[in-house]
Design a protein with these regions (language model features):
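Conserved catalytic motifs of ABC-family nucleotide-binding domains
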Residues: 160
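Catalytic Walker B motif of ABC-type/P-loop ATPase nucleotide-binding domains
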Residues: 164-168
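Conserved ABC ATPase "signature" region
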Residues: 117-135, 183-186
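Conserved ABC ATPase signature
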Residues: 139-143, 147
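Helix-to-loop junction immediately C-terminal to a conserved catalytic motif
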Residues: 56
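The feature captures the beta-strand-to-loop junction immediately N-terminal to the Walker
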Residues: 41-43
Length: 246
C-alpha cells in the first residue's frame, strides 16, 4: 500500500536537553519527509541517542518542539505517537522467541481491537508484504538474524504507520542480514513511509539515506547527502576519519 506524500511530515525544532547542568543536546533542528530515509549520526557522546529518544518519546526535551504533520507531539507518550502514525523499532529484541512468526504479528494485531476477519486479512497482507509467508509457522527462536530483523520490522508496521523510527537496525546482524535490512528500508521508503534511523554503522547507513545529520557536542555539525558529508573536512576530522571511503 503506497502512501500519499504530503511534504514535510516530521519537524524537530530547537531541541534542548540538559543533565546535571550540562547541555547534551543544544538546539537541534531536523526535518524528514515522507518517502525519504534520513540518518542521524555522530561520535559517542555527541547527543544523537538523546535526540533520537526525544523524537521517539522516551525522553522529553527541556525546550523546543517536535511537530508531526503540523501537530505538536512533544508531550505525547509513545503509545499516543503510535496512534498518530509513528512506528518505532527498538534496538533491543522485541519479538517473543517461543511464539511463531504469525503469532508474533497476531499478538500486536490483537491490541488494535479489530474484528477477527480484519486481523486475519491484515496478518496475511503483512506476511506477504515483508516476504515472510514461508516462515509463518516457524518459531521465532529458530530464525536467522536477517529473518528476525524482518519480523521485528513487520511487527512495527502492524499499526500502518506513516513514519518509522529505527534504532540501530544494522546492529548485531551479519552482512547478508544488513543487506536484507537495507532492502526492506528501501521498500518502505518507496511505499511512502518517512524513515529516521540512527546507527553506528556509518557506511551501511549512508548507503541508503537520502539525507543525513552528523552531530557533535550536542549540535548538528553538518547535514546533507552522503557526498556532502564525506567531502566535508570537519565531518572527517571529528567523525568519519581521513581514510573513510564509500
Amino acid at each position: 500500500m503506497e502512501l500519499q506524500n504530503n511534504g514535510h511530515l516530521l519537524e524537530i525544532n530547537n531541541l534542548i536537553k540538559s543533565y546535571d547542568g550540562k547541555r547534551v543536546v543544544d538546539g537541534v533542528c531536523m526535518k524528514v519527509k515522507r518517502g525519504e530515509v534520513v540518518g542521524l549520526l555522530g561520535p559517542n557522546g555527541a547527543g544523537k541517542t538523546t535526540t533520537f529518544y526525544m523524537v521517539v518519546g522516551i525522553l522529553r526535551p527541556d525546550d523546543g518542539n517536535i511537530m508531526f504533520d503540523g501537530k505538536d507531539i512533544t508531550k505525547l507518550a509513545m503509545y499516543r505517537r503510535a496512534r498518530n502514525g509513528i512506528g518505532y523499532l527498538s534496538q533491543e529484541p522485541s519479538i517473543f522467541r517461543k511464539l511463531t512468526v504469525e503469532e508474533n504479528i497476531a499478538a500486536v494485531l490483537e491490541t488494535l481491537h479489530l474484528p477477527r476477519e480484519v486481523r486475519m486479512n491484515r496478518l496475511k497482507e503483512l506476511l506477504e508484504e515483508l516476504k515472510i509467508s514461508h516462515l509463518a509457522k516457524k518459531k521465532a527462536y529458530m530464525l536467522s538474524g536477517g529473518e528476525r530483523r524482518r519480523l521485528e520490522i513487520t511487527r512495527a508496521l502492524v499499526t500502518n504507520p506513516l513514519f518509522i523510527l529505527l534504532d540501530e537496525p544494522f546492529s548485531g546482524i551479519d552482512p547478508i542480514a544488513v543487506a536484507d535490512a537495507q532492502e526492506i528500508i528501501g521498500e518502505l521508503k518507496n511505499k511512502g513511509l518517512g524513515i529516521l534511523l540512527t546507527d553506528h554503522n556509518v557506511r551501511e547507513t549512508l548507503e541508503i539515506t537520502n539525507h543525513s545529520y552528523i552531530m557533535a557536542g550536542g549540535k548538528i555539525l553538518i547535514e546533507g547527502t552522503k557526498e556532502v558529508l564525506i567531502n566535508d573536512p570537519k565531518a572527517r576530522e571529528i567523525y568519519l576519519g581521513e581514510k573513510f571511503r564509500m
